[in-house]
Amino acid sequence: MGGISIWQLLIIALIVVLLFGTKKLRSLGGDLGGAIKGFKNAMSDEEKKALEDKEAAAQTTQQATEKKPEADKKEQA
């Protein structure tokens, strides 16, 4: 009752096609797809960078903890 029926959606789609034409809609769809693809690539690049930073920090922490016992042994001697 309060929602949009399939017939109303078809009428809206027909009006949009008549106003813009199929060529314009096709190029608009391609542009939108390219934008979404670029956004996904940027997000995956950020995730990779964050993962690399996290691994580098973990490696640095591990190296620091390995050096600390060696320093303690030298102080005891």
Curated annotation (Swiss-Prot):
Q: Name one Pfam family in it.
A: TatA_B_E
GO term, biological process aspect, one: protein transport by the Tat complex
By its UniProt entry, which InterPro entries does this protein fall under?
TatA/B/E, TatA/E
Regions of biased composition (Basic and acidic residues) lie at 47-56, 65-77
Q: Which domain of life is it from?
A: Bacteria
Q: Which GO terms describe its cellular component?
A: TAT protein transport complex
Q: Where is this region: Disordered?
A: 47-77
Q: Name one GO molecular function term.
A: protein transmembrane transporter activity
UniProt subcellular location: Cell inner membrane
Spell out where the chain crosses the membrane: 1-21
Major location (coarse): membrane
Q: Which UniProt keywords apply?
A: Cell inner membrane, Cell membrane, Membrane, Protein transport, Translocation, Transmembrane, Transmembrane helix, Transport
Coiled-coil stretches are: none
Annotated membrane topology: Single-pass membrane protein
Q: Which family does it belong to?
A: Belongs to the TatA/E family.
Role noted for this protein: Part of the twin-arginine translocation (Tat) system that transports large folded proteins containing a characteristic twin-arginine motif in their signal peptide across membranes. TatA could form the protein-conducting channel of the Tat system.
Subunit architecture = The Tat system comprises two distinct complexes: a TatABC complex, containing multiple copies of TatA, TatB and TatC subunits, and a separate TatA complex, containing only TatA subunits. Substrates initially bind to the TatABC complex, which probably triggers association of the separate TatA complex to form the active translocon.
Q: What is this protein called?
A: Sec-independent protein translocase protein TatA
